[in-house]
């Protein structure tokens, strides 16, 4: 990790990663890096660590999409691939449909917005810190709504640190200012953190990388 403020060195630092799934997804989409959607998130996180750091667990926060059907299928395939990873857990929020007016044409449409991810991440970070399960919380997000748990960690558990890893095309000055360190996830990390083209589940079923993600 880079751009990290000075801290007391230790023989080994336990790291738990907290990944804001849609913040990462929309960052990749903004960068037009669809070929990196097929990410082994555990490997991506591992590739961000320093030699003295050990990845204890990866927590992925997302919501199930329900339309269009082809997008729902691609997400389901990706989630099933993630479920083959032993030290990764998925936490679900939900979509809430909001009626919005188009600025250009004036028509109204239902626009889904993802809910609960920031709350779920905050709860997990604070819970893990309280149970002394980590030395470093690695937050993969640029959502400024996540400043509150960083402040809480610094106040309640000053011996622990929060490092922010910004997804591609994403940044938050507030998170950068509050965190103990930060980095930007780049192409090189993503390129070496992909699942293989085919992923076999425990029951023998083989998952295929979606064609649109190649």
Task: Tell me the role of every PLM-derived stretch.
Residues 1-4, 120-122:
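Short, motif-level signal for alpha-helix interfacial/capping segments enriched in acidic residues
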Residues 2-112, 161:
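Domain-level signal for Mg2+-assisted phosphodiester chemistry and nucleotide/NA-binding surfaces
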Residues 89-214:
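Nuclease catalytic cores that cleave nucleic-acid phosphodiester bonds
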């Amino acid at each position: 990790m880079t751009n990290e403020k000075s801290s007391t060195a230790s023989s080994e630092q336990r790291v738990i990663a907290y990944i804001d799934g849609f913040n990462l997804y929309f960052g990749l989409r903004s960068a037009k890096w669809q070929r990196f959607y097929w990410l082994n998130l555990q490997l991506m996180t591992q590739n961000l660590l320093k030699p003295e750091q050990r990845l204890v667990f990866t927590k992925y926060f997302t919501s199930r999409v329900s339309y269009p059907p082809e997008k729902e299928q691609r997400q389901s395939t990706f989630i099933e691939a993630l479920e083959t990873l032993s030290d990764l857990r998925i936490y679900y929020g939900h979509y809430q449909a909001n009626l919005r007016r188009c600025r250009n044409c004036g028509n109204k449409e239902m626009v889904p917005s993802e809910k609960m991810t920031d709350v779920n991440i905050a709860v997990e970070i604070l819970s893990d810190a309280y149970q002394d399960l980590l030395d470093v919380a690695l937050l993969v997000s640029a959502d400024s709504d996540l400043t509150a748990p960083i402040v809480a960690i610094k106040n309640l558990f000053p011996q622990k640190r929060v490092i922010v890893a910004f997804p591609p095309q994403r940044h938050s000055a507030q998170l950068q200012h509050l965190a103990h360190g930060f980095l930007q996830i780049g192409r090189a990390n993503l390129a070496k953190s992909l699942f293989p083209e085919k992923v076999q589940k425990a029951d023998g079923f083989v998952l295929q990388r979606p064609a649109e993600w190649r």
